[in-house]
Amino acid sequence: MASQRISNEPAYVLHRYDWSESSLILDVFTRHHGRVALVARGAKKPSSSFRPILLPLQPLHVAFGGDAEIRNLKSAEWQGGHVMPSGDALLSGYYLNELLMRLLARDDPHPLLFDAYAATVQLLASQNPDTLQLALRAFELRLLQGIGLLPRLDAETATLTPLAPHQRYVLVAEAGLRQAHDDDRFSLSGAQWQALQQALGGKSLFSDTLQACVACANELKIQLRALLHYHCGVRVLKTRQMMMDLQAL
C-alpha cells in the first residue's frame, strides 16, 4: 500500500535534533495529525531552503510522507504573521513546547488544542507582559482538558456535588477539585471555578478562557503547576528550572 502524503498542513516545530551532519529530526505539532516526527534531509546545509524556516514558535505549512515512525519532510513554508518571541516570552514558548512534548502522544490529533497553541504563541509574540501569564494559564487549562486530565471545574470531583459560589476550593493532582482546608494557601471561589468551566465548555473560544483567568491567574498558577508536574512525572520542568536559574543571576 502506498504511503500517505500530507500536504499544506498547519504546523509548529516543537523541538529539533541533529540526525546527521546535514539533516535534522523534528518533533512537530500539526493541526490534523497531532504530534509527528519528521526527518528534514539536508536542512543543516547552508543552501537548504529549510534552514531559515524550521524554527520553533513560527507558523508553518508542511508537507510530509512515508509509512515509518519518522516520516520525510517534503516541504515547509513560513506563514508569517508575527515575530519570534524574545526574553520571558521566548522561554514561555519553550515551556509550552515542553508540555506538549511530554503530554501529547504521537499521531493523536487535537485540532482545538492546536488552535489554542497558535493563539497563545501570537500573544507571546506581542511581548505584552500583561497578557503573558494569562495566556499561559489559559493554555494550560486547554491542554489538560484536551488530553482528558482536567476534572470538571463546576463540581467536587469525589462527590460530584455542585460547587457553592462563595465556598473556596482547590485543585489537587491526586484528588481533583475539593473544598479548601485552612492550610491551603491558594484557592478559588466556587464562582471562579464555575466561570472557568463555562469558558472551557462547548465551542467557546480561547479568548473566553483567557478572560476567565483574569480574576484568578496567580492562584491558578500554583495549582496548575502542581497538576502538570504530577502528570509529567517530574518535580520541575526543564524550562521552568531554566527560568529560575536566570532569575537567580
UniProtKB/Swiss-Prot annotation:
InterPro entries: ARFGAP/RecO, DNA_rep/recomb_RecO_N, NA-bd_OB-fold, RecO, RecO_C. Keywords: DNA damage, DNA recombination, DNA repair. Gene3D superfamilies: Nucleic acid-binding proteins, Recombination protein O, C-terminal domain. GO terms for biological process: DNA recombination; double-strand break repair. GO terms for cellular component: bacterial nucleoid. Pfam families: RecO_C, RecO_N. Involved in DNA repair and RecF pathway recombination. HAMAP family: RecO. NCBIfam families: reco. Belongs to the RecO family. This is DNA repair protein RecO.
